[in-house]
């Protein structure tokens, strides 16, 4: 929970706790802890939302959110839902981290065995995960920005995999991004 507030301090200064405290005892604990942590960060606005309402708001008003903190089950569901705003599960990075020790950066999607070997997997979530790692674990915002800018320019240029409406293969998209990174 504390990491959510620390992250919000570097962004738009807002944290939303997503839980189901009206039903689940574990969510009541989450809410109690989050309210305590919120007091340590008076400069960060904080609210809480039940997961069913959050699912609706993510689609109807995604701009209302900055940093969402939630338990794994709800996070898995909401991140898959939110990926549809970008057009594909294949674009979204994720981070799992605690107060100490290493963090895990990975795409939110699974291994996609149904498209294995076809050369059509979207590489953006993996590339965006690397950018997130450079930013959060190595404090290399400059490199992270080069990567994300290159990803965005590649998409804007129309080089995308089929899940985003394009016809490019995984390697073509990856190589286009690498070329843009090298040019920047």
Predicted regions located by residue number:
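Glycine-rich phosphate/nucleotide-binding loop
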Residues: 58-158
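Loop/helix-junction capping segments adjacent to catalytic residues or to phosphate/diphosphate-binding pockets
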Residues: 24-28, 141, 171
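Glycine-rich phosphate/diphosphate-binding loop of Rossmann-like nucleotide-binding domains
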Residues: 1-52, 64
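A glycine- and small/hydrophobic-rich beta-loop-beta segment
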Residues: 43, 60-65, 179, 183-184
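Glycine-rich phosphate/pyrophosphate-binding loop and the adjoining helix
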Residues: 1-10, 15, 21-23, 146, ...
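Alpha-helix boundary/interfacial micro-motifs
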Residues: 36, 83, 88-89, 139, ...
């Amino acid at each position: 929970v504390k990491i959510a507030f620390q992250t919000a301090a570097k962004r738009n200064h807002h944290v939303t706790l997503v839980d189901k405290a009206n039903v689940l005892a574990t969510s009541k604990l989450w809410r109690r802890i989050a309210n305590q942590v919120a007091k340590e960060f008076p400069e960060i606005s904080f609210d809480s939302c039940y997961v069913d309402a959050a699912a609706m708001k993510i689609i109807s008003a995604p701009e209302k959110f900055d940093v969402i903190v939630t338990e794994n089950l709800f996070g898995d569901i909401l991140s898959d839902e939110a990926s549809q705003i970008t057009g594909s599960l294949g674009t979204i990075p994720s981070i799992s981290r605690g107060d100490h020790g290493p963090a895990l950066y990975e795409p939110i999607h699974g291994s996609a065995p149904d498209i294995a070997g076809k050369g059509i997997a979207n590489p953006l979530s993996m590339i965006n995960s690397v950018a997130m790692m450079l930013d959060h674990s190595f404090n290399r915002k400059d490199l992270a920005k080069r990567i994300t800018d290159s990803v965005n320019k590649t998409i804007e240029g129309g080089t995308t995999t089929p899940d985003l409406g394009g016809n490019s293969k995984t390697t073509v998209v990856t190589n286009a991004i690498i070329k843009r990174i090298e040019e920047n």
